[in-house]
């Protein structure tokens, strides 16, 4: 029998705390019965929710703390106030100590990133973490990163994102050599800022066996599934993510409005109900909730703070899959293949000289 996946939950994270975290984890448990949970936060509030979900209660342990990080706190403030005592820190610390395999939080993104770096540290050869998400496409799904961990990136960092993203794609999609594209304003080699053009030169020159670099991808290529992995720096990646989520909700609202406008449209909806449900499920941001913090010496999943139980369940699902399919080992194997490491990665100028 396979060992259970142990998931540490920041039960106080997000807009709704235990009222979403507990039922959300319970939904994920129905899909992955080989899971157990450690919940950190206000034990009274957590236990009130666990009493409503006996199956979840049977596989959960609660660790009490009165300290919770708010969504408004700056990372530096969160570290000063919540280090060693907050529900967010304790969930991460459980991963560091080996008591849990993955931490999941819907809390303050900046605080979670700062605490993750401070507590878990970075993998060898990686300077900065990235947030990667699974993006539904016309083709199937793609890994897109960075969607908000940091602003700006030089060529070397973009190349490291490509390597980490390809490792995640191999885990999720069972692809031996994922295709990787750099997000740009055009596909021509002369277009884009210098950092992106240098990253393209670097990836071509390295000719990595773990990935197939296909060049530049424009914004519309994300939804088309132009590559298995699409790489960008965090500022533009976060804008792209929020734009896509907003567009999905906008289209869903258009459909709802159109289908209820007249009696004919209502009858038409009845005939096409299953097709509309499939479309709605495909566009539902909750189905792909759960950003993976890549580059850390531990697995951390960030859920949207305002999601509901179904959305939080998706984030827990992502954490389960990252552990079950051994993401950290695959990233390390990629970075350290044949004794190499990203610290030996040349600059673009060195690589092409």
Swiss-Prot record:
InterPro entries, sorted: FA_synthesis, Phospholipid_synth_PlsX-like
UniProt KW keywords: Cytoplasm, Lipid biosynthesis, Lipid metabolism, Phospholipid biosynthesis, Phospholipid metabolism, Transferase
Tree of life domain: Bacteria
Pathway: Lipid metabolism; phospholipid metabolism
Catalytic activity annotation: a fatty acyl-[ACP] + phosphate = an acyl phosphate + holo-[ACP]
Coiled-coil region list: none
Localization in the cell: Cytoplasm
GO cellular component: cytoplasm
Top class in the EC scheme: transferase
Main location, first listed in the record: cytoplasm
Family in the record: Belongs to the PlsX family.
UniProt subunit comment: Homodimer. Probably interacts with PlsY.
Entry function: Catalyzes the reversible formation of acyl-phosphate (acyl-PO(4)) from acyl-[acyl-carrier-protein] (acyl-ACP). This enzyme utilizes acyl-ACP as fatty acyl donor, but not acyl-CoA.
Protein name as annotated: Phosphate acyltransferase
Lineage of the species this protein comes from: Bacteria, Pseudomonadati, Pseudomonadota, Alphaproteobacteria, Hyphomicrobiales
